[in-house]
């Protein structure tokens, strides 16, 4: 179905191009443009490599279908949500530079019922990962808890941090503005009382655009602006 939709969008683009060429040559004899189709116009953004493609998928065969579509139609960037069987094709995903957004299930089970820490497995096989909650399946405030689960079962804390900061920023093309602490980027940050991935810790300071908007009562009596 996806491939058919992409082919129809390509045909729509060709019809638009023919109309524009005819209109330039002789406006009086140009045929009517094709009826406007907003769905096809949305897919043109993909064909013209103006937006990335994010696909919800789980099974390995469907994952590889998505990879083939990306190669056939020249997607600018492909990312996969959930992708619970991505460990079966991790090497292929790494080779094609596909990002996997892991969650809400952080631990999956292989065909022999062995636990697989999906985020860690993919990272060790060279796949760029992000971690999500899939809100409202897991509520958004529990994002760091999702990352903590991956850490508990083997993912390096530094990679878990990247998976909820700079990696997703890069995935949506905003890495020059957000995702890490660097001069010139948005100064939005939280200072925690300890390890970010220890759920017993609390936020001490919250800064938005460099302005402190929250201070815990544990710090100088606390302040909210």
What are these regions (language model features)?
Residues 1-77, 202:
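Polyanionic/metal-chelating signatures
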Residues 54-59, 75-85, 104-110:
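Catalytic beta/alpha-barrel core
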Residues 182-224:
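C-terminal cap of metal-dependent C-N hydrolases
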């Amino acid at each position: 179905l996806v491939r058919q939709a992409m082919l129809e969008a390509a045909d729509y683009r060709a019809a638009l191009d023919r109309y524009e060429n005819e209109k330039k040559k002789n406006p009086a004899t140009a045929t009517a443009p094709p009826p406007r189709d907003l769905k096809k116009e949305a897919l043109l953004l993909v064909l013209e490599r103006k937006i990335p493609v994010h696909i919800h998928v789980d099974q390995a065969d469907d994952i590889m279908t998505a990879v083939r579509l990306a190669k056939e139609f020249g997607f600018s960037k492909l990312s996969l949500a959930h992708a619970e069987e991505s460990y079966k094709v991790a090497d292929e995903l790494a080779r094609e530079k596909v990002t996997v957004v892991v969650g809400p299930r952080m631990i999956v089970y292989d065909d022999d019922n062995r636990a697989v820490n999906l985020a860690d497995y993919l990272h060790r096989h060279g796949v760029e990962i992000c971690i999500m909650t899939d809100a409202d399946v897991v509520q958004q405030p529990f994002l760091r808890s999702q990352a903590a689960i991956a850490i508990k079962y083997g993912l390096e804390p530094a990679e878990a941090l990247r998976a909820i900061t700079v990696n997703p920023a890069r995935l949506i093309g905003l890495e020059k503005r957000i995702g890490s602490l660097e001069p010139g980027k948005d100064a939005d940050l939280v200072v925690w009382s300890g390890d970010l991935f220890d759920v017993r810790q609390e936020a001490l300071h919250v800064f938005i655009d460099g302005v402190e908007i929250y201070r815990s009562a544990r710090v100088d009596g606390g302040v909210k602006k």
